[in-house]
């Protein structure tokens, strides 16, 4: 017996039943983004490894442990994108989009990270990314937060999600703070948990994210980042908070909130939920005002966010908000005898040409008529049309209304009109 083949660990198939929810979510997302005048951009899955190293930082978990990198046949180091912002920045620089006054972009697609798979965290995962370039005032920070808030309301999850926000100042501010944070944590070096010991001299900001109870107690005594932030960043953040207050947006100022990627500065935020265990961040983002210049472009302010689609789907499924009920087939066409198959196909195409919105299914199964009729009923089809040699010869077709339990005989032209009456009632 051949050994069963399986997908790569941490990479999943998304089957039609689940994708019904995905498509409904994606449609809502796209409508909201369009209403805010954001334009879609489609980006390569592969990028040069060095741009992630430059942008994300060599001593981050993403670059050190999580990237899928390899060399191509010419020896170039390439990486499956672990996130979308870097590729988007590369694209706007390469294609001179900022000179065309293009500012607001969105994309949706797979990202890849070599992490330990668990509920809500996979090695291939889908993200919505939204990026805005060229605007440096807190007004655009507010627009981003208003947009996300509107999305949560339209999805029906706004009561199950909370916003945490912080300002992490400039890179220089964080360098000053990092020295003080390391100096403080060295006093507790012997009792730090293993993750914190590893990060103490490489990426101490990630220690602020620790979920360890002992670490949380220690961090309560730690110096606060806000005391090292420049006046401009403080004013920017205070202005944003005042505007959020005026719009009634609820938020938590989490002074330990930092982001795991080096390119962030000033405003950072996360939207969190409680329903899916430790992987409770469903949306995260912030400003990255130096990244465009660091990757070779002109100095350009920027802000963006990403939403994990799998985590969003998990939440919506747990709340039973969006139904994945099978959409009914409108017309189920049954042909009797192999010789009548061509006529059945032709009729289905003719109906599609006249009524392109209808869902039409042609049953190609080689089984009895009674079995095909049962299949039509089980499919929840609205009507079934039976086609046999006699029907074609006499131009008289049996239409079974499976919802009302009625049967009719029609000529082909009458059949086309009856379909219109059934599915295109006046006013619809």
UniProtKB/Swiss-Prot annotation:
It catalyses: tRNA(His) + L-histidine + ATP = L-histidyl-tRNA(His) + AMP + diphosphate + H(+). InterPro entries: aa-tRNA-synth_II, aa-tRNA-synth_II/BPL/LPL, Anticodon-bd_dom_sf, His-tRNA-ligase, HisRS-like_core, HisRS/HisZ. Its main location: cytoplasm. Signal peptide: none annotated. The keyword Ligase applies. GO terms for molecular function: ATP binding; histidine-tRNA ligase activity. Pfam families: tRNA-synt_His (PF13393). It is an enzyme of class 6 (ligase). Keywords: Aminoacyl-tRNA synthetase, ATP-binding, Cytoplasm, Ligase, Nucleotide-binding, Protein biosynthesis. GO terms for cellular component: cytoplasm. Its EC number is 6.1.1.21. It is found in: Cytoplasm. GO terms for biological process: histidyl-tRNA aminoacylation. PROSITE patterns: AA_TRNA_LIGASE_II. Belongs to the class-II aminoacyl-tRNA synthetase family. Homodimer. HAMAP family: His_tRNA_synth (MF_00127). This is Histidine--tRNA ligase. The gene is hisS.
